[in-house]
Design a protein with these regions (language model features):
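Long, contiguous N-terminal structural blocks used for assembly/anchoring
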Residues: 1-95
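Acidic, proline/glycine-rich low-complexity IDRs
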Residues: 2-33, 102-161
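Surface-exposed, interaction-prone regions used to assemble/regulate multi-protein complexes
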Residues: 52, 62, 69-70, 80-132
């Protein structure tokens, strides 16, 4: 992997993922942030090590190159859950069913988050239903398989120690 380091800004250029900025993170979490053309929030790689080699770079590159497709798949998963399990979003059956019938499900501002191996998520930071405030709704995957949809309203921000 060809990496050029800018020591002052903690930015590396990764051959497959572009420029990655190492973010100061709490505790033993290491976070790299990258950009995705056309996707305002970009992506994060969150690891237990600062070594990017533990990330599945080829997998991440494939997801971010096809980010719009994956965003649409995640929105379709949300649409199904709104209709079948509105309680996941703390919504009534009627509100969930009505939201699921909208032409565009009102979830926006996707941020792609990758972990070790092929675990990843798309976190929709904003939505028109007031769900998941203030952290959003996370659609989680292992590889291409959906593993869960989570309302992040009960999440807590991790503070530096």
């Amino acid at each position: 992997v060809e990496e050029k380091r800018d020591r002052m800004a903690n930015i590396i250029h990764h051959a497959k993922l572009g420029d990655l900025c190492y973010m100061k993170s709490p505790q033993s979490i290491h976070c790299w942030h990258g950009t995705i053309t056309g996707c305002e929030q970009g992506f994060d790689i969150i690891l237990a090590s600062s070594n990017l080699d533990v990330a599945d770079v080829d997998f991440i590159a494939d997801i971010i190159q096809n980010w719009k497709y994956h965003e649409e798949k995640a929105l379709e998963h949300i649409r199904v859950k709104l209709a079948t399990q509105p309680e996941l979003f703390n919504l009534s059956k009627e509100t969930g069913k009505n939201a699921s019938k909208l032409k565009d499900v009102p979830f926006d501002c996707p941020q792609f988050v990758f972990y070790e191996k092929q675990e990843w998520a798309i976190v929709f930071l904003e939505n028109g239903l007031g769900v998941g405030e203030p952290f959003g709704v996370s659609v989680n995957f292992n590889g291409k398989a959906l593993t869960g949809i989570y309302d992040l309203s009960d999440a807590e921000e991790i503070e530096d120690e």
